[in-house]
């Protein structure tokens, strides 16, 4: 609806119930302390506990942890129909837009083709820490939120502001750790006399 990026998590780990939980914390909590930690001055007001998650059928979105956490917090889960990839167009489009925004600007880019790359030494210039990448992606999100979206004919941030004016601000989670714990996997063990 707003086309806003509500949250993200940068990790070297494969997608999992844990990374989904971390991303939901980022979605639901006030981003100002996190932005200060990244030393980024921008307004990312899009936050709050979602009422609905529209997901594809990846294993991390079918986890017991996600189902349990969403049930505890009144978040409805809605899955894309199997074999219907066009239902994921909005999410796939934002990923494509993000990749287009960052591809030619990140240190070590390979550019679109060898002619465009020229003498640029991609391999020796490719050096970012995860924190630097997270900061860079955050700035890209800020640019995206403030740029006119072709489908909306207005910036996503303006669409968010209109929605908030109409229906109010979503409830922001203030206890991030407690919220995260509700979305973490549980491992069940049988206790015996010997351990």
What residue spans do the PLM features occupy?
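Short, conserved catalytic/metal-binding motifs centered on acidic residues
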Residues: 3, 53-56, 88, 144
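C-terminal or mid-to-C-terminal helical accessory/interaction module adjacent to the motor/catalytic core
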Residues: 121-132
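Flexible loop/turn segments at secondary-structure boundaries
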Residues: 15-18, 60-63, 85-87, 151-152, ...
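RNase H-like two-metal-ion nuclease catalytic core shared by retroviral integrases
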Residues: 55, 63-73, 78-121
């Amino acid at each position: 609806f707003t086309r806003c990026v509500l949250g993200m998590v940068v990790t070297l780990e494969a997608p999992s119930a844990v990374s989904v939980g971390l991303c939901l914390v980022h979605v639901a909590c006030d981003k100002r302390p996190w932005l200060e930690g990244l030393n980024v001055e921008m307004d990312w007001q899009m936050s709050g506990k979602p009422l609905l998650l529209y997901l594809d059928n990846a294993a991390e979105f079918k986890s017991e942890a996600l189902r349990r956490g969403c049930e505890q917090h009144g978040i409805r889960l809605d899955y894309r129909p199997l074999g219907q990839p066009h239902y994921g167009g909005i999410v796939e489009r934002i990923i494509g837009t993000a990749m287009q925004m960052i591809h030619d600007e990140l240190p070590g880019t390979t550019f679109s083709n060898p002619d465009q790359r020229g003498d640029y030494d991609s391999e020796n210039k490719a050096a970012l820490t995860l924190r630097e990448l997270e900061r860079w992606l955050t700035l890209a999100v800020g640019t995206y939120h403030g740029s006119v979206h072709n489908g909306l004919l207005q910036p996503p941030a303006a669409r968010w502001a209109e929605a908030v004016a109409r229906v109010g601000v979503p409830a922001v989670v203030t206890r991030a750790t407690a919220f995260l714990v509700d979305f973490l996997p549980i491992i069940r063990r049988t206790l015996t006399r010997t351990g």
